[in-house]
Amino acid sequence: MADKLDIKAFLDKDEQKDLLRLLTAGSVDDGKSTLIGRLLFDSKKLYEDQLDALERDSKRLGNAGEHIDYALLLDGLKAEREQGITIDVAYRYFSTNNRKFIIADTPGHEQYTRNMITGGSTANLAIILVDARMGVITQTRRHTFLVSLLGIKHVVLAVNKMDLVDFSEERFNEIVAEYKKFVAPLGIPDVTCIPLSALDGDNVVDKSERTPWYEGLSLLDFLETVHIDSDNNFSDFRFPVQYVLRPNLDFRGFCGKVASGIIRKGDKVMALPSGKVSHVKSIVTFDGELDYAFPPQSVTLTLEDEIDVSRGEMLVHPDNLPVVDRNFEAMLVWMDEEPMDINKSFFIKQTTNVSRTRIDSIKYKVDVNTMEHSSVPFLSLNEIARVVFTTAKELFFDPYRKNKSCGSFILIDPITNNTSAVGMIIDRVEKKDMNIADDFPVLNLPELGIAPEHYEAIEKAVKSLSEQGFEVRIEK
């Protein structure tokens, strides 16, 4: 009985640990997979059968000579092992006494930029590896730019293979100075630099005696203690409605995930786009009612008044509204094998909202290696650009730098259903500055000879179309 209680206590404690999502990025052979493998190995997070398989595979496929090749723990695809590179995003989970971790090992090659964007989309922290012999190279700059684009606020520059430069403090300081000079204009608020050797384990889990001049934490100690709670936006309440729950006539609740901000029982809320106002009656979860909710909790809100709210709409505080607009510009990462057709319309999915959208213009493409801007007529796979959009119906958004959940979106090809691109909203664009015709369809009911008693039925049909992403405006 005591053993069972101990197990339950352990599971309860593990459940209460906070979670750090991190990604690793770096050039080919900088040692990303080796570093994560070493982290798992030295923190005693591998089972005996995994260790046995690792030793066998190291002899057969390894690239570490007489050493165990820790990279094989993460390079799961056959092509990756044969080429000694990472192609897909490899996820690994482990926990320590202080924190739980999900690691995304992302590919370093430019042709797999979309894989890195996918792996880093939910990350709190990025580990960017550089080879101590090579220093800051083009790929280092590219990965850092992508990390800044994703809004990741914590970056660890892991200067790996310090054993190959005799753990030189001078060499480490040269690399740090060059990197910090490059990263300063990108606006990443927290950059930490750590000298290490992934193969030998120096400064990975424990401080190394071979770097007496380094006064900082080991990598694992830093990951356990880095403060990420303040990264969440607790100021701007945004609740995209995912589903309207009505199990019986006495209950009507709005289900969704709190994207940002805090909501309490009794708070005044406004439904967008209708502008109707009510108060929160209850905050319901599977485990019972709450007095308040915060991101990223999934809850059901009930309101004091019967107001019409559907999937894709949003509940907010009336004195703190998002941008409500159809015109905006964003940084777009093209992820489709097919090049962009700028004359084609797409579905845009932003929070739970879906609409038709068109691409009005490409302001410039960013060369991710040199940071130079250039004018282009379209985008190809893995290319990044600043793009202007017009949507068929209004979206409710915040700039991505302020609110990741409400400032990000995907473009969906309406024919293939492929995810064509991901985007990070910069801000609204004033229509007067666009000089672009508004060519979405308009139904002028009086001109069509439709009697007023039929207006309500037509409005319901148009609303149904709107929920599917087809916007038709009505004029009465």
Curated annotation (Swiss-Prot):
SUPFAM superfamilies: EF-Tu/eEF-1alpha/eIF2-gamma C-terminal domain, P-loop containing nucleoside triphosphate hydrolases, Translation proteins
Pathway(s) per entry: Sulfur metabolism; hydrogen sulfide biosynthesis; sulfite from sulfate: step 1/3
Keyword Translocase: no
Keywords, in A-Z order: ATP-binding, GTP-binding, Nucleotide-binding, Nucleotidyltransferase, Transferase
EC number: 2.7.7.4
GO MF annotation: an example: GTP binding
Pfam families: GTP-eEF1A_C, GTP_EFTU
Residues covered by the tr-type G domain: 17-232
Name of the protein in its database record: Sulfate adenylyltransferase subunit 1
Region (G5): 197-199
Region feature (G3): 105-108
Region (G2): 84-88
Domain of life the protein comes from: Bacteria
Job of this protein: With CysD forms the ATP sulfurylase (ATPS) that catalyzes the adenylation of sulfate producing adenosine 5'-phosphosulfate (APS) and diphosphate, the first enzymatic step in sulfur assimilation pathway. APS synthesis involves the formation of a high-energy phosphoric-sulfuric acid anhydride bond driven by GTP hydrolysis by CysN coupled to ATP hydrolysis by CysD.
Gene designation per UniProt: cysN
Family: Belongs to the TRAFAC class translation factor GTPase superfamily. Classic translation factor GTPase family. CysN/NodQ subfamily.
Subunit field text: Heterodimer composed of CysD, the smaller subunit, and CysN.
GO biological process: hydrogen sulfide biosynthetic process; sulfate assimilation
Binding site for GTP: 26-33, 105-109, 160-163
Keyword Cell membrane among record annotations: no
Major enzyme class: transferase
Record field: catalytic activity: sulfate + ATP + H(+) = adenosine 5'-phosphosulfate + diphosphate
